[in-house]
Amino acid sequence: MNKAILAVAMVLLLAGCATKPEEIGRAPDLSPVAAHLGMQNNPQFNGYPARPGKASYSLWDQRSTNFFKDPRAATPGDVLTVIISINDRANLDNKTDRERVSKGIYGGGGSFATSSITGAAAGGDMDASINTHSDSKSKGKGTIERSEDIRLQIAAIVTDTLPNGNLIIRGSQEVRVNNELRVLNVAGVVRPRDISGNNTISYDKIAEARISYGGRGRLSEIQQPPYGQQILDQFSPF
């Protein structure tokens, strides 16, 4: 019995730790290159043609840039630059005031008379009434103020082509500074005609855009409560 209690206590103690045991005393590891692209299981990448070799006795090297080819990304494996410039501000103020009062009186009356065995008459009146009253009030007020200013550039790679010609792109960037890892991810669907001549595209032209900017490390861990406290906050009724 004591061993079971000790085991449960150790599990709760480890659950309350904010830092993973394997990351104690060391900086977060960087993800492998192309780990977010799934290149191993993507047939588009596996079937991507290799660059041709240099032809013998030829003045033109096929490995050089083609002067007549569009430099914009168009096929899986091509790279383009995503420009993220978000300056979003929102102010929302909601207020509700509801009041409901209802009253009701329900009543009835009647008279009756009886004769006793001795012949004396007995009579009486009956009056029954029910009073109801209900009062309900509710007030609510909510205010939201949000301000976001993000200006970044990230290179993304074309991972797939849709049947209508649109491109699926995905990009990831990781920068580690002083044991803090900053991670930027972007993904979405773009139209080839929205890609500019310098092979860049703005974030607002990406459909189904998924943009995340965060980090891992000591600073990020301090800003959030430990796992154990999060579990208690989730299930505690108080």
Curated annotation (Swiss-Prot):
GO cellular component, one term: cell outer membrane
Subcellular location(s) of the protein: Cell outer membrane; Bacterial flagellum basal body
GO biological process, one term: bacterial-type flagellum-dependent cell motility
Lipidation residue positions, type S-diacylglycerol cysteine: 17
Residue stretches in coiled coil: none
Pfam family, one: FlgH
Lipid attachment, kind N-palmitoyl cysteine: 17
UniProt keyword list: Bacterial flagellum, Cell outer membrane, Lipoprotein, Membrane, Palmitate, Signal
PANTHER family reported in the protein's UniProt record: FLAGELLAR L-RING PROTEIN
Function: Assembles around the rod to form the L-ring and probably protects the motor/basal body from shearing forces during rotation.
Protein name, entry field: Flagellar L-ring protein
Gene this protein is translated from: flgH
